[in-house]
Amino acid sequence: MRYHMTLITFDERNQVFHLSNKTISYIIGLEKATYLSHLYFGKAIKRYHNSRKYPLIDRSFSPNPAGLPLKTRDFSLDVIPQEMPSHGHGDFRNPAVQIKQVNGSSITDFVYDSYEIIAGKPALKRLPATYVESDSEAETLVITLVDRLLDLTLKLSYTIFADRQVIARNSFLENKGQESVIIKKIASASLDLVSQDLELISLAGRHNKEREIERQTVQRGTRIIDSKRGSSSHQANPFIALVSSKTDEFTGTAIGLTLVYSGNHEMLVERDQFEQTRVMAGINPFGFEWELAPSQ
């Protein structure tokens, strides 16, 4: 059984979301009916045949998530390409969301709950954002994740436009529990890529010399481009691109990330032990704490 709309489909049998227009496709998988995985982002494809699943291999020091009744060691969040990684269940890379509880714990386990496909692009309350003038111009996929122990709901929004090579994303966290939590970090978007041949383009600068193009090979470890000035600033533009080594101004593969609304922001790129690259963009966690009370 397949649920069809013009730009977004859900393959119930293979548990795959496919966002696609005439030029691009963005594909999300559901692993073990529990965790979101990133499968593909690139040129448009007509149909996904479940051929890009990440290989399940027993990797030393990459543990199974505690909440799954697995009999083998071939599934670990430490290696699976994810959409919105959190902390405390076997993924030792940088998390996209980090919550502090009243008891001091920062462990969260956001698992899949449901999805909704919406015509158009819902507005963001009190925030500037991309928009459409007609619902026929775009469609939006909203995936709901839940942490059942903390009773937190995390909604991930993905908008694909009919005639743009763009996926617009945002994150919405709601506390349905009985105790307040402190948001230490929450990214607007996170993306894991298995490509090994990547370079990072960023736009540094200073007064009267803005947007100087810097390009460097993505090495193992973490590279952060951020602003702590209270604004996006000309010192650290809230834009980066991951490109292949052969990409130039006219041809080649490129994935760009930019924040539409930014004050103190962080653009993070991490290459792990398996040569995979995690990239995320959002509010700078430096000096950031937000108390999320019950029902907020």
Model-derived segments and their meaning:
Residues 1-4:
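Short, Lys/Arg-enriched N-terminal segments with co-localized hydrophobic residues
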